[in-house]
Every structure is written in structure tokens, then in C-alpha cells.
UniProtKB/Swiss-Prot annotation:
Residues annotated to bind Mg(2+): S233, T254
Name of a matching Pfam family: MMR_HSR1
GO biological process: tRNA methylation; tRNA wobble uridine modification
Places the protein is found: Cytoplasm
Binding site for K(+): N229, T248, I250, T253
Protein name: tRNA modification GTPase MnmE
Protein purpose: Exhibits a very high intrinsic GTPase hydrolysis rate. Involved in the addition of a carboxymethylaminomethyl (cmnm) group at the wobble position (U34) of certain tRNAs, forming tRNA-cmnm(5)s(2)U34.
Length: 457
């Protein structure tokens, strides 16, 4: 398969030390040669070499650059690739790109370089999606999972499962088409059930990692809730180590929702500092309270903050009711002051949920809180090198569908259905697993997936 030659800026827009303009395609080296001036033509250059020179337009030098030449097939796209390293100015970089376009290159679509790597067989679809996961990773663990997926760990597992299914289907077909062959082992219902159970167990094992994988990939929407002036904004600022929220002794000073991402011991949290939830006549504060209630309803995880220096109120107890059904940690703040809170009542309300004491004004208790969050979601350490990790929402959905098809095979066999009937669901499971790696996928889905990438990737 041969495509045209594409070009795009691969680095983020704006001022910086360098910017990279990438070309890929059959004419990549020739097009770059038309605008690059040095002692040696790029067309004569060996693969994976770097060359110093200038970019000229109508005889005028417009950039001083370093150019990398990489010849097919030992490139990301398996095509000839040229990368021009220029100074990171907005005007100069765009001028170089426009010059390439005028000399025969076409502007790349979002994700087109990665799409070509997939279409040319350099990577499969799950590996291509892992590229975006790596770019978006917010923690070292998330990065580790993405890198392992890019290396093909998930792909190999899925292909092994598909091969198990294919072997069973092939034997069923031989039995149906050539029943007179005595030397071909008959695929009995018992044998097919054993094959199905083997694949089904592996799919279930993959899905068991999905919840933690989804946390690593997307982060947890974390609502910090509590009555006004219990220390919610102080907690936010301590976790992110920045003064993002207003901290005063005046109740109700947080009128809006403040969001910030933070990495807590490998757990990516999207922290939402909500306005204090209470009954109020202040119109502006009332809007903030309503937004807080919505954030609470949508949250994956809750930090419920109480003031240890005050007695438990009806509003506090209502927060426990609102948090029911969520994972949450109770934060008993202001331990530097006299304890007036009924701790036994708090334990009763919290049930099995962790309780951590803090004095945010004295920087006390934060480590214990971080450890409680890590333990709550990651029982022990996640092994980012685990080859069976699944974190992509599309993959999880396909695995669930494949599991349903495999369950249908098991049910059919147990009901005594003929092997040639239950093989329909077996084939469906094979197809669904193939959609994860891109071995069976529609063009419309490919366009949708790769359009999520940035230009130049």
C-alpha cells in the first residue's frame, strides 16, 4: 500500500527551543531536498543520519536547521521519513511547513502518521491507541501500562486467544465438511467446552484488571466535600502544592468549583474543590452549592472533610448519606484544636471507609491520607509491566461482548446444542477480539480513533 507524502508540525505550537516538522511518504526525502541546502543532498544520505544546513525560499535563508533522514522500512510509518529540527518560533516553523506543502507535500490529518504505521503493519490498533495513552498519561504507572501495550503485550495475548478459538473452529469445520475422514479427531462437545472455558477464563482475568486500568488511564473524578470552612480548600492546596483555592476563616468563600489534576502515589485524581454544602439564602453561593451537589453525584471518589473542633451536625450526617455508594475517605481536619467531634459516631457513619486525621495548617496527616487513597484503589502495588493489563474503554467493551458470546457457547453446549450451531457464537467472539487489535475493524472506526490524535502524530 502506497500513500502520498504528508507533512505536519509534530511539536506543540508556541515559542520553544526547537520545533519539529515531520514528513512521511514516498517523496519525503525529495521534497525536503528541494528546500534544504547543505554540502550534501539528502537524497544521497544514508538512513538514520542527521545533517546540518539551511532552509531557503527563493534564494533567501529562512531557517537554520538539523534534518534527520530515515529510510523505509526502518521507520515509525514504514515509509521514508524526514524530520526537520528548526527553532521553536511560530512564524518560522509555519513558514517551513508552508514551503514543504508548496513543494509537493500534503498537510497531514490528525493522527495520520500513526494511522499509516497501523495500515503499513508497523503496529496494530491496540498499539496505536497506546500511543495516545502514553501522551495523555498522568502518572508513571499509567505511562508504564501504555508502554507495555505499545510493546505489544496485550496484542500477543489477544492473538493467542484468537488462535485458540480459530483452532477449535477449524476442527469443527473439518468434522462438518469431511465426516468420512477417520484420521481427523472429532471435536466433541466436551472438547469444545474445554477450549471455550480456557479462553473465557483468560478474558475474565483481563476484565478483572479493567477497573484499575481505567483509573490509571482516565483518573478519578474526586469531589472534596464538607460544610463551609472545614478545610476543603486547604486540602486541595496541600495536595497540589499550590495556592489555587481561597483559604479564609469566612464560611462560604468558595463560590464555584475548582478543578485540578494531581498524582497521589500513582493514583491520578481530578480534584474538584466544591463550595460548602449547606442551606443558604445567598443567591451566588446557592448556585455553587447546586454545582457541588452535581459534582458529588458524578464523582468516582469522595474526600469527606469534617471539622474535628466542632460537633457533628445534621448537615455532616447528610453528607455521609450523599456519599453512600461511592468510595470515600473521611478526613478529620483541625486536629491541632480541641476535639469536639464524636469520633465513635463518625466511625459508625463511615462504616468500612477509611478515616484519616489531619492538621492541614501544620502540614500533618497528608502522608497518611495519600496512603489511604492508594490502598483503597490499589491493593498492593500495581505492576505496570503486567502483560495482561487492559485500560482502554473500547477494549473493555469488546472484551465484555466477547465474554457474552463465549458464555453463549458454554450455555449452548450445556443445553446439548449441536457443535455446528454453537460455533456461530464462537466465531462472534473471535471477531470481537479481532476488533481490539484491528484484525477485524471497519474503516469508519479507524477514522474516528485516529482523529483523536494531534496533528503531526
Amino acid at each position: 500500500m502506497e500513500f502520498d507524502t504528508i507533512a505536519a508540525i509534530s511539536t506543540p505550537p508556541g515559542e520553544g527551543a526547537i520545533a519539529i516538522i515531520r514528513l512521511s511518504g514516498p517523496e519525503a526525502i525529495q521534497i525536503a531536498d528541494r528546500i534544504f541546502y547543505a554540502k550534501k543532498n539528502l537524497s544521497e544520505a544514508e538512513s538514520h543520519t542527521i545533517h546540518y544546513g539551511h532552509i531557503k525560499e527563493d534564494g533567501e535563508v529562512i531557517e537554520e536547521v538539523m534534518v534527520t533522514v530515515m529510510r523505509a522500512p526502518r521507520t515509525f510509518t514504514r515509509e521514508d521519513v524526514v524530520e526537520i529540527n528548526a527553532h521553536g518560533g511560530i512564524v518560522s516553523v509555519n513558514r517551513v511547513l508552508q514551503l514543504l506543502l508548496r513543494n509537493g507535500a500534503n498537510l497531514a490529518e490528525p493522527g495520520e502518521f500513526t494511522k499509516r504505521a497501523f495500515l503499513n503493519g508497523r503496529i496494530d490498533l491496540s498499539q496505536a491507541e497506546a500511543v495516545m495513552d502514553l501522551i495523555r498519561a498522568k502518572t508513571d504507572r499509567a505511562m508504564g501500562v501504555a508502554i507495555r501495550q505499545m510493546d505489544g503485550n496485550l496484542s500477543r495475548l489477544i492473538r493467542n486467544l484468537r488462535q485458540e478459538i480459530l483452532d477449535a473452529l477449524a476442527q469443527v469445520e473439518v468434522n462438518i465438511d469431511y465426516p468420512e475422514y477417520d484420521d481427523v479427531e472429532e471435536m466433541t462437545q466436551r472438547m469444545l467446552l474445554e477450549k471455550t472455558e480456557l479462553v473465557r477464563a483468560s478474558v475474565e482475568q483481563l476484565l478483572q484488571t479493567a477497573s484499575q486500568g481505567k483509573i490509571l488511564r482516565e483518573g478519578l473524578a474526586t469531589a472534596i466535600i464538607g460544610r463551609p470552612n472545614v478545610g476543603k480548600s486547604s486540602l486541595l492546596n496541600q495536595l497540589i502544592q499550590e495556592e489555587k483555592a481561597i483559604v479564609t476563616d469566612i464560611a462560604g468563600t468558595t463560590r464555584d468549583i475548582i478543578e485540578e489534576y494531581v498524582n497521589v502515589r500513582g493514583v491520578p485524581l481530578r480534584l474538584i474543590d466544591t463550595a460548602g454544602i449547606r442551606e443558604t439564602e445567598d443567591i451566588v453561593e446557592k448556585i455553587g452549592v447546586e454545582r457541588s451537589r452535581k459534582a458529588l453525584a458524578d464523582a468516582d471518589f469522595i474526600l469527606l472533610v469534617l471539622n474535628q473542633n466542632e460537633e457533628l451536625t445534621v448537615e455532616d450526617e447528610a453528607l455521609f448519606e450523599a456519599a453512600a455508594g461511592h468510595n470515600y475517605v473521611v478526613v478529620l481536619n483541625k486536629t491541632d484544636l480541641e476535639t469536639k467531634l464524636d469520633i465513635n459516631k463518625v466511625r459508625e457513619l463511615a462504616g468500612e471507609n477509611p478515616i484519616v486525621s489531619t492538621s492541614l495548617v501544620n502540614d500533618e496527616g497528608l502522608e497518611a491520607l495519600e496512603e489511604a487513597i492508594k490502598t483503597l484503589f490499589f491493593a498492593g502495588d500495581i505492576d505496570a509491566g503486567d502483560a495482561t493489563y487492559v485500560s482502554n474503554v473500547r477494549h473493555i467493551a469488546l472484551l465484555h461482548q466477547a465474554l457474552e458470546a463465549l458464555n453463549a457457547v458454554t450455555t449452548g453446549i450445556q443445553l446439548g446444542m449441536p457443535v455446528d450451531i454453537v460455533q456461530i457464537d464462537m466465531t462472534r467472539a473471535w471477531d470481537l477480539l479481532g476488533e481490539i487489535t484491528g484484525d477485524s475493524v471497519q474503516d469508519e472506526l479507524l477514522d474516528q480513533l485516529f482523529n483523536q490524535f494531534c496533528l503531526g502524530k
